[in-house]
Amino acid sequence: MGQAEQQKQYTPAEYFALEAQSEVRHEFFEGEVFAMAGASIAHSTIAQNFILKLRPALRGKNCRVQIEAVRLAVEENRHYTYPDVMVSCDPADQRESQQLNLPILIVEVLSPSTEAYDRGLKFNQYKKLPSLRHYLLVSQTTWLVEWYQLTEYGAWAHTALAEANDALAIPELGLAMTLAEVYEEAGVAPMKLNFGAEATGAF
């Protein structure tokens, strides 16, 4: 989460007014407003790689894929975020012009300043979204994608993808993506190479 604004509490209307005139995006939680920090090149490249795979995969499926410029209403008047990537296939979201409400997939690229938030409070809030089936936490320091998938029993199953030949496959979205494709041109080393550098004292 970014830095809280100096004003201690905002109403939802004040938050929307701030977003309409600000060049910086803000997230909102229970009256507090947080400015979002700028993304690194690796962060931005990883998000773009997901978009490049998702757009053709979703063609003809009546789904929308959006980047971090589009707001998500996690809970109206209480919690608004800007996921790095999200996909909604809900008909109600097809009519929205300012925000999405019912995503099936959310991708967050982890940053040092937001990782605890993305793993903790944010994920706990995202779990309340009735449409959400897949939540991806993507490292930007090594090849690691953590995939949380809602099972038919209502539990969230966790899968860690860290090997070069590991692949993310979400058939209902037509998505099949290897780790190499996730990290293409991002300048991020595979986990084994990172471990090797640490073991040899290389930098």
Ranges and model annotations:
Residues 1-203:
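Gly/Pro/Ser/Thr-rich low-complexity, intrinsically disordered segments predominantly at protein N-termini
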